[in-house]
């Protein structure tokens, strides 16, 4: 059974993928400073003179996945909630070319990881419950450590979604944030088991 923590768990796994990939890729030395990865709404990211080199992963939409839902329904069983998660991946930088370098590395990482494998999910979720640098783990991270996402049967596919200029402009206008170089992805399909009988 997959819990309601599935959405946050997928975001945490993607964030971990990006953080580790940037570290392995030596991006810090390429841009001349530290980088970070966040999972915040774009309007909460510092822009302007205080802007820092970072990637942001934002879950901007959740849609129904009717294919998986209909495949899993059997008479008398619980009706699953099958979802596709849509992410906006954005690069920020304070100096020339930082955004392009960060976004290029992120696009490569996502391309090289078309499927979230069970072991990666399990390892990431397990690590969420541990303290980092002797700091107390936030309650949200501690809750995610109890997620059963890794025990699921469905594979989680990372699929690029290529929005046109007009669609991207509408998305950024709706977010009420300053436009930054971005890419969009769909993670399919996340299933939350339901209690409602078919």
Regions of interest found by a model, annotated:
Residues 1-69, 142-152, 157-159, 163-164:
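Small/polar-rich, solvent-exposed N-terminal microdomains that initiate assembly or binding
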Residues 79-94, 104-105, 181-189:
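Oligomerization/assembly interface segments of phage tail-like spikes and tubes
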Residues 101, 112-187, 192:
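Acidic-leaning, charged glycine-interspersed low-complexity segments
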């Amino acid at each position: 059974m997959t819990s309601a923590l599935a959405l946050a768990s997928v975001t945490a796994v993607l964030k971990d993928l990006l953080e580790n990939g940037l570290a392995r890729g030596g991006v810090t030395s390429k841009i001349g400073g530290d980088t970070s990865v966040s999972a915040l709404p774009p309007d909460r990211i510092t822009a302007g003179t205080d802007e820092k080199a970072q990637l942001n992963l934002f879950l901007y939409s959740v849609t129904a996945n009717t294919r998986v839902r209909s495949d899993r329904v059997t008479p008398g069983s619980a009706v699953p909630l099958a979802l596709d998660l849509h992410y906006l991946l954005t690069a920020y930088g304070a100096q020339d070319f930082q955004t392009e370098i960060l976004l290029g590395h992120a696009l490569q990482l996502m391309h090289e990881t078309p499927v979230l494998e069970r072991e990666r999910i399990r390892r990431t979720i397990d690590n969420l419950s541990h303290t980092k640098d002797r700091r107390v783990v936030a309650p949200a991270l501690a809750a995610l450590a109890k997620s059963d996402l890794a025990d699921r049967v469905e594979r989680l596919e990372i699929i690029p979604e290529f929005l046109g200029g007009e669609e991207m402009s509408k998305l950024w206008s709706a977010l009420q944030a300053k436009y930054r170089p971005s890419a969009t992805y769909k993670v399919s399909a996340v299933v939350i088991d339901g209690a409602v009988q078919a």
